[in-house]
Amino acid sequence: VRDAYIAQNYNCVYHCGRDAYCNELCSKNGAKSRTRGGYCHWFGPHGDACWCIDLPNNVPIKVEGKCHRK
């Protein structure tokens, strides 16, 4: 398990505006707990993104490099 920005397809983060959205998303993907599985966290000049706590290794995370949307 690891703490990380959860990623969509093509190495893209889930942008957010509130902790509740991220906590639900992270928890549904197996993060630490229903009460605090994740939160909306600063992601640099690109805005805020969902940060997950103790996310399982089989769930994609943001890695170095650009988001490559099709």
Swiss-Prot record:
InterPro entries: LCN-type_CS_alpha_beta_dom, Scorpion_toxin-like, Scorpion_toxin-like_sf, Scorpion_toxinL, Scorpion_toxinL/defensin. Pfam families: Toxin_3 (PF00537). GO terms for molecular function: sodium channel inhibitor activity; toxin activity. GO terms for cellular component: extracellular region. It is found in: Secreted. Keywords: Disulfide bond, Ion channel impairing toxin, Neurotoxin, Secreted, Toxin, Voltage-gated sodium channel impairing toxin. Its main location: secreted. One of its GO terms (biological process) is defense response. Disulfide bonds join C12-C67, C16-C40, C22-C50, C26-C52. SMART domains: Knot1 (SM00505). The keyword Ribosomal protein does not apply. Expressed by the venom gland. Residues 2-68 form the LCN-type CS-alpha/beta domain. Alpha toxins bind voltage-independently at site-3 of sodium channels (Nav) and inhibit the inactivation of the activated channels, thereby blocking neuronal transmission. Has the structural arrangement of an alpha-helix connected to antiparallel beta-sheets by disulfide bonds (CS-alpha/beta). Belongs to the long (4 C-C) scorpion toxin superfamily. Sodium channel inhibitor family. Alpha subfamily. This is Toxin Boma6d. The lineage of its organism: Eukaryota, Metazoa, Ecdysozoa, Arthropoda, Chelicerata.
